Amino acid sequence: APTLARFLQKNGYATGHFGKWHMGGQRNVADAPPISAYGFDQSLTNFEGMGPKLLPLTLKPGQNPEKPGRIWADATRLGNGVRWMQRSHITEGFVNEAIPFMEKEIAGNQPFYLNLWPDDVHSPFWPPTVKWGDGSKRRLYLSVLEAMDQQLGKLFAFVRKHPKLSGNTLIMVCSDNGPEKGAGVA
């Protein structure tokens, strides 16, 4: 099937995907094509997708930080390059990989397409423990939304400050999920 990344790659763009992946390599599919088969030169995903990934550790207030929970621990079978980090910092991990990807392509005068798919606002919500507040779904949602906004802000600041990108970059923002009962509405 045609993909935007594959089209751009064939037309000279460097392509990178950093974030959620739902196009093969799911929790129960160990033989899906790698993300590169969809047109991406570089990728870093979360629990799904073949290849390098950030896997989430979870903490609740009062939980022993030496014994965090693990979401989808068996996802390690889907590829090498697994790094574990707090769920509340996964988008930061994606942004911290996306910026060097852009820097490398800029240095080589290479046009690029960057796919950044954070999923912070997908339940269950795992903000930093200091941001749990009353623990209500609405509070947790707001906390993960604010954390995601901070990371997107870091990415946008990089684009704004870079002379080759400022005024020459198209940014599209879409949400991972629709309304979540109990999380509030805009």
Protein language model regions, located:
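Formylglycine-dependent sulfatase
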Residues: 1-186
